[in-house]
Amino acid sequence: VEYATVAKEPELYLGCWVAWSGRISNAVTEGSSYRCDLLVGYENMERVEGFVPLFFEEAPYPAIDGERPVKVLAKIQVENGKILLNGRAVYQPLRRNGE
């Protein structure tokens, strides 16, 4: 499901799993957990479709590199009408393009 579709009526997608790509910002590790903002659609650094808080109970390993795009598998949560993601898995290439 696309971000724009979910953003229109987030409650309809409560508990659904999505695989969204983008970039990470404002990352914080607290104990064994990890939280950040996912800049949905910003993998090519051209256009941000939306900002979504993303939380992992266990910090991803290896650590996410904020300088490179990611794809996350996460469950949609809704709080006060806003989309939140409960992360399950992260895909991030080990090398940057051209390395």
Can you describe what each PLM-predicted range is?
Residues V1-E99:
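OB-fold and OB-like single-stranded nucleic-acid-recognition modules
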